[in-house]
Amino acid sequence: MSLLSKTRELNTLLQKHKGIAVDFKDVAQTISSVTVTNVFIVSRKGKILGSNLNELLKNERIIQMLENRHIPVEYTDQLMDVKETQSNIGIDNVLTVFPPENNDLFGDSRTTIFPILGGGERLGTLVLGRVTEDFSENDLVLGEYAATVIGMEILREKHNEVEQEARDKAAISMAINSLSYSESEAIEHIFEELGGKEGLLIASKVADRVGITRSVIVNALRKLESAGVIESRSLGMKGTFIKVKKDKFLDELERIK
């Protein structure tokens, strides 16, 4: 497969995800396919965003690392010290992605590291490992292209997260401001009763304890549900199941007390 064909295969994957979050596991699988390598896509803090490994590489330590979805802190720091592409790293180097304890299997292995950059900052690292064959110039071109594309996707996700947080904050603020004084008081007591982000509420019990009518509680919950801040489900005589949908809601509720 030519370099152009391999590049197009990566582009095709990204076009499938246009407008939605990219699955970095899919990206890792595609990179692995077109470069015939073991692949790790790692965040700047060492979280494994995506990976694709052949069975030969999966020793006990690697399997544990994949289950934790995190590489060791020491290796994360070593990767972050790499400022530009380093290619064809041998197994005796601390930067190798292959387990040194299996030197008999991976004595001829090669690791290549591509820093992932975007928006003027380091976002993570693309690590490729090959059991026997050196990385060619075409491999390096493709790897650097893949790292650039991954960087753009990470930036896009971060931007989307910031936008979503802003929308959530506005929705929470509007919902709280729409509550009357008695409804606001009712909501405070409701979440004190729940003691967390979800739980079972018996409205009459709270109403009797606080000295408000049940209708005030119902109206307050309805306003929050309409704003998308919570979801509720009646369980009949057992009460009402309530779940917070906006993570920052309880923090904001605590702030305005």
UniProtKB/Swiss-Prot annotation:
GO terms for biological process: negative regulation of DNA-templated transcription. Pfam families: CodY (PF06018), HTH_CodY (PF08222). It is found in: Cytoplasm. DNA-binding global transcriptional regulator which is involved in the adaptive response to starvation and acts by directly or indirectly controlling the expression of numerous genes in response to nutrient availability. During rapid exponential growth, CodY is highly active and represses genes whose products allow adaptation to nutrient depletion. It comes from the Bacteria. The keyword GTP-binding does not apply. Residues 1-155 are annotated as: GAF domain. One of its GO terms (molecular function) is DNA-binding transcription factor activity. The keyword Cytoplasm applies. The lineage of its organism: Bacteria, Bacillati, Bacillota, Bacilli, Bacillales. Residues 203-222 bind DNA. This is Global transcriptional regulator CodY. Belongs to the CodY family.
